[in-house]
Amino acid sequence: MASEQEILSGLAEIVNEETGLPTDSVLADKSFTDDLDIDSLSMMTIVVNAEEKFSVRIPDEDVKNLRTVGDAVAYISQAQG
């Protein structure tokens, strides 16, 4: 099971691969849409990659609740537990 810091780091790598954003700009308090300018298509790719990387399932209806990077970290952390 990954720690929250490992999840954050892993998500930053996934976001970087999808968007080209530097990993150090992917912080827990950043909004996927407002701060990182991630559209819904990119978000779905990020979710799929996160599911694979962390061996979790993130149902589509839950994705809309993942507004910030921190929301996603907490969700993945809980889903692993």
Curated annotation (Swiss-Prot):
Function: Carrier of the growing fatty acid chain in fatty acid biosynthesis.
Domain of life: Bacteria
Disulphide bond pairs: none
Name of the protein this chain belongs to: Acyl carrier protein
Organism: Kineococcus radiotolerans (strain ATCC BAA-149 / DSM 14245 / SRS30216)
Domain Carrier span(s) in chain numbering: 2-80
Entry comment on modification after translation: 4'-phosphopantetheine is transferred from CoA to a specific serine of apo-ACP by AcpS. This modification is essential for activity because fatty acids are bound in thioester linkage to the sulfhydryl of the prosthetic group.
GO BP, sorted A to Z: lipid A biosynthetic process
Keyword annotations of the record: Cytoplasm, Fatty acid biosynthesis, Fatty acid metabolism, Lipid biosynthesis, Lipid metabolism, Phosphopantetheine, Phosphoprotein
Residues modified as O-(pantetheine 4'-phosphoryl)serine: S40
